[in-house]
């Protein structure tokens, strides 16, 4: 028999009661503030910031025309758009205070938002396995290392894939 999933808003409300969730937030926020993954510093964030400074061209051709590294952002438009809002806010703050920190912070926050979205989707679909999902996904050393230490953006296509599967269900 088909089971209807609870709305994400209800899952979100219940999630805030979980101490494991709070522990994961503390760990991940500490890493967001303390770490600067090289791949983000040298490739991803400069690529996006370059487009803010000259948004006339497509991001990839504009970056190459400005002398950027061809390996800088090997992702498509959806990945670019996913990082755009929070990185733009950070870039605006950087320009206001004449620093170079908040664009990087904004980029990392976009990954954190997607991480929470993916957690919500998993909790929504696998309603009877909350504790396991919180331990094995939310506190997974592998996920934390790949996303927050190494700085990869692979959570975005994974979250989109899982979301599309929930729509099929």
Residue ranges and their predicted role:
Residues 120-124, 156-169:
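Specific aromatic-rich, kink-prone transmembrane helix
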Residues 1-35, 124-130:
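Start-transfer (signal-anchor) and selected internal transmembrane alpha helices
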Residues 43-74, 78, 88-95:
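Extracytosolic helix-loop segments that constitute the early lumenal/periplasmic catalytic or substrate-binding loops
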């Amino acid at each position: 028999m088909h089971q209807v999933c609870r709305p994400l808003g209800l899952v979100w409300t219940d999630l805030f009661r979980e101490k494991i969730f709070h522990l994961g937030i503390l760990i991940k926020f500490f890493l967001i503030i303390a770490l600067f993954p090289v791949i983000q510093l040298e490739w991803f964030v400069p690529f996006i910031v370059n487009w803010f400074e000259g948004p006339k061209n497509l991001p990839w051709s504009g970056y190459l025309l400005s002398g950027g590294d061809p390996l800088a952002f090997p992702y498509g438009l959806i990945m670019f758009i996913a990082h755009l809002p929070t990185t733009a806010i950070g870039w605006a703050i950087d320009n206001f205070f004449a620093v170079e920190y908040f664009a990087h912070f904004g980029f990392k926050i976009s990954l954190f938002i997607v991480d929470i979205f993916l957690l919500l989707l998993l909790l929504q679909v696998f309603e009877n396995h909350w504790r396991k999902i919180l331990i094995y996904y939310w506190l997974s050393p592998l996920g934390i290392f790949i996303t927050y230490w190494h700085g990869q953006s692979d959570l975005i296509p994974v979250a989109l894939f899982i979301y599309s599967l929930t729509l099929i269900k």
